[in-house]
Amino acid sequence: MRLVVVAGPTASGKTALAIALARRLGGEIVNADSQQVYRGLDVGTAKPTAEERGAAPHHLLDLVEPGEGMDAARFAALADAAIAGIAARGRVPIVAGGTGLYVRALLHGVVEAPGRDPALRAALEEEAARLGRPAVHARLAAVDPAAAERIRPNDLVRVVRALEIAAGGRTPSELYQAHAFREDRYDAALLALDPPRAELHARIDARVRAMFAGGLLDEARALEARFVGALPARLPIGYAEAAAHLRGELDLEEAIRRVQVAHRRYARRQVIWLRRERGVAWIAPPHDVEALSRRVLEPRPPAIR
């Protein structure tokens, strides 16, 4: 069975290409975007619309409530089940998303890490509440600079988890290096979209403005009403800024600007992650769907394998 993977930075056109390939190949799409697993957070995560979902079946959207956890190991298990079901129906599984950790977990397995430490977790969360999240992130930078570079200071869930792992005797980076991700769990054709940087930034900026005009503020308002006092520590990009605008802490243009910058930085991290992955076929626009459809199903596409 050939698995098709459509990856790339945010706003690069992954959904459109995945749908076009699904319609051409008779495929179904498996989401690999960690932000689109949350129920009720549709506009701010650029989740496929009802029309797009009608054009091709989608899986692994709307899995958890905001504030709940979803890690790469759980994603890989759910994706394995979805892919098996798609293949059993005689259709082509197409994984689409820009979360590199999810894609890597699916294609190469996950790192066996130490278990959770509730006492350490509580202490670090208390420190973050007292001194701010950057202070906890600085702890991580002191023990594992490479991990600190990968994880945003405001992503408290991942920062705390990395420190839990480091407390077990080996840093996250050491564990990842030892694993090496050499195992190929699937026969996969991995496509990565590669639009010119200026074009990508323009698309990001336009998308963020459309989000604010098209419902992001309403979604942030609903979160504020649900989580009175403090939003969950780990939310997709844009919701904290939208909520700050609703509270009168940011004017609209400043909120939009901050979200645009955050998405551009996220896109850069996504590209860096993918460039470390082996066997990637970088695809520049425009996309010849017919040619790509033939290419991804070849037994050993030379530019992909």
UniProtKB/Swiss-Prot annotation:
Site note Interaction with substrate tRNA, residues: 99, 121
Recorded superkingdom: Bacteria
Cofactor (UniProt): Mg(2+)
Keyword Chaperone among UniProt keywords: no
Biological process according to GO: tRNA modification
Residues binding substrate, per UniProt: 10-15
EC number: 2.5.1.75
Catalytic activity: adenosine(37) in tRNA + dimethylallyl diphosphate = N(6)-dimethylallyladenosine(37) in tRNA + diphosphate
Stretches that traverse the bilayer: none
HAMAP family for the chain: IPP_trans
Name used for this protein in its record: tRNA dimethylallyltransferase
